[in-house]
Amino acid sequence: MKDAEKTVGKIADKAKICYLSYIDGKGFPVTRAMLRPREREGITTFYLSTNTSSNKVASLTANPNAGLYFVDTRFYRGVCLTGTVEILTDDESKKRIWRTGDTMYYKKGVTDPDYCVIKFTATGGRYYAGFKNEDFEI
Protein backbone atom coordinates (compact mmCIF):
# COMPACT_ATOMS: atom_id res chain seq x y z
CA MET A 1 0.00 0.00 0.00
CA LYS A 2 1.66 3.16 -1.17
CA ASP A 3 -0.31 5.76 0.80
CA ALA A 4 -2.13 4.45 3.89
CA GLU A 5 -3.83 7.78 4.59
CA LYS A 6 -5.32 7.95 1.11
CA THR A 7 -6.18 4.25 0.72
CA VAL A 8 -7.69 3.75 4.17
CA GLY A 9 -9.48 7.10 4.03
CA LYS A 10 -11.08 6.23 0.71
CA ILE A 11 -12.30 2.83 1.96
CA ALA A 12 -13.68 4.40 5.16
CA ASP A 13 -15.44 7.21 3.31
CA LYS A 14 -17.13 4.90 0.81
CA ALA A 15 -18.29 2.31 3.35
CA LYS A 16 -21.94 2.55 4.34
CA ILE A 17 -21.29 0.53 7.48
CA CYS A 18 -18.27 -0.44 9.54
CA TYR A 19 -17.69 -3.12 12.13
CA LEU A 20 -16.66 -2.35 15.69
CA SER A 21 -15.02 -5.19 17.63
CA TYR A 22 -14.37 -5.26 21.35
CA ILE A 23 -14.24 -7.61 24.35
CA ASP A 24 -17.44 -8.04 26.35
CA GLY A 25 -17.81 -8.30 30.12
CA LYS A 26 -17.36 -12.08 30.00
CA GLY A 27 -14.08 -11.81 28.10
CA PHE A 28 -15.40 -12.82 24.68
CA PRO A 29 -14.94 -10.93 21.40
CA VAL A 30 -17.99 -9.15 20.00
CA THR A 31 -18.39 -7.49 16.60
CA ARG A 32 -21.16 -5.01 15.86
CA ALA A 33 -22.19 -3.53 12.55
CA MET A 34 -22.38 0.25 12.92
CA LEU A 35 -23.36 3.11 10.67
CA ARG A 36 -20.18 4.57 9.23
CA PRO A 37 -18.37 7.14 11.34
CA ARG A 38 -19.93 10.59 11.32
CA GLU A 39 -16.53 12.25 11.16
CA ARG A 40 -12.90 11.29 10.93
CA GLU A 41 -9.59 13.04 11.42
CA GLY A 42 -7.24 11.47 8.91
CA ILE A 43 -7.09 7.75 9.62
CA THR A 44 -6.34 8.23 13.29
CA THR A 45 -9.60 9.39 14.89
CA PHE A 46 -13.15 8.33 14.06
CA TYR A 47 -16.41 9.47 15.67
CA LEU A 48 -19.48 7.19 15.79
CA SER A 49 -22.85 7.58 17.49
CA THR A 50 -24.53 5.00 19.71
CA ASN A 51 -26.87 4.49 22.63
CA THR A 52 -25.37 5.14 26.05
CA SER A 53 -27.44 2.24 27.42
CA SER A 54 -25.96 -0.27 24.96
CA ASN A 55 -23.92 -3.27 26.08
CA LYS A 56 -21.05 -2.08 23.88
CA VAL A 57 -20.72 1.17 25.85
CA ALA A 58 -20.50 -0.78 29.12
CA SER A 59 -17.94 -3.16 27.61
CA LEU A 60 -15.86 -0.40 26.01
CA THR A 61 -15.86 1.59 29.24
CA ALA A 62 -14.45 -1.44 31.07
CA ASN A 63 -11.96 -2.31 28.31
CA PRO A 64 -11.32 0.44 25.72
CA ASN A 65 -9.28 -1.75 23.33
CA ALA A 66 -11.13 -2.12 20.04
CA GLY A 67 -10.95 -2.74 16.32
CA LEU A 68 -12.72 -0.84 13.55
CA TYR A 69 -13.12 -2.65 10.22
CA PHE A 70 -14.06 -1.21 6.84
CA VAL A 71 -14.64 -3.28 3.70
CA ASP A 72 -14.73 -2.39 0.01
CA THR A 73 -16.88 -5.17 -1.47
CA ARG A 74 -16.38 -3.93 -5.03
CA PHE A 75 -12.64 -4.61 -5.01
CA TYR A 76 -12.65 -7.18 -2.18
CA ARG A 77 -10.30 -5.27 0.07
CA GLY A 78 -10.55 -4.13 3.65
CA VAL A 79 -8.77 -2.54 6.55
CA CYS A 80 -8.89 -3.34 10.24
CA LEU A 81 -7.74 -0.52 12.48
CA THR A 82 -6.75 -1.28 16.06
CA GLY A 83 -6.75 1.19 18.89
CA THR A 84 -8.74 2.46 21.84
CA VAL A 85 -12.06 4.18 22.36
CA GLU A 86 -13.34 6.89 24.61
CA ILE A 87 -17.05 7.35 25.34
CA LEU A 88 -17.96 11.04 25.04
CA THR A 89 -21.14 12.39 26.63
CA ASP A 90 -20.41 16.11 26.68
CA ASP A 91 -22.73 18.44 24.77
CA GLU A 92 -20.02 19.73 22.44
CA SER A 93 -19.08 16.25 21.20
CA LYS A 94 -22.71 15.22 20.80
CA LYS A 95 -23.59 18.37 18.84
CA ARG A 96 -20.51 17.95 16.67
CA ILE A 97 -21.74 14.74 15.04
CA TRP A 98 -25.52 15.19 15.38
CA ARG A 99 -27.37 14.79 12.07
CA THR A 100 -30.87 15.57 10.88
CA GLY A 101 -32.98 12.48 11.47
CA ASP A 102 -31.09 11.28 14.54
CA THR A 103 -34.25 11.65 16.62
CA MET A 104 -35.23 8.34 15.04
CA TYR A 105 -32.65 6.76 17.37
CA TYR A 106 -32.45 9.37 20.13
CA LYS A 107 -36.00 10.55 20.83
CA LYS A 108 -35.03 13.40 23.16
CA GLY A 109 -32.72 15.01 20.63
CA VAL A 110 -29.08 15.98 20.92
CA THR A 111 -29.32 16.22 24.72
CA ASP A 112 -30.81 12.72 25.06
CA PRO A 113 -28.93 10.99 27.90
CA ASP A 114 -29.12 7.77 25.85
CA TYR A 115 -27.05 9.36 23.04
CA CYS A 116 -23.27 9.33 23.18
CA VAL A 117 -20.23 9.46 20.93
CA ILE A 118 -17.65 6.73 20.48
CA LYS A 119 -14.27 8.30 19.74
CA PHE A 120 -12.01 5.63 18.23
CA THR A 121 -8.29 6.42 18.09
CA ALA A 122 -6.27 4.09 15.86
CA THR A 123 -2.68 3.12 16.61
CA GLY A 124 -2.20 0.64 13.77
CA GLY A 125 -3.92 -1.49 11.23
CA ARG A 126 -3.91 -4.31 8.74
CA TYR A 127 -4.81 -3.81 5.09
CA TYR A 128 -6.04 -6.70 2.93
CA ALA A 129 -6.12 -6.66 -0.87
CA GLY A 130 -5.10 -9.00 -3.66
CA PHE A 131 -4.86 -12.01 -1.32
CA LYS A 132 -2.20 -10.24 0.76
CA ASN A 133 -2.12 -8.64 4.21
CA GLU A 134 -0.04 -5.64 5.13
CA ASP A 135 0.38 -4.32 8.68
CA PHE A 136 0.97 -0.63 9.22
CA GLU A 137 1.40 1.82 12.10
CA ILE A 138 -0.35 5.11 12.48
Locate the predicted segments by residue:
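N-terminal leader/targeting helix
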Residues: 18-48
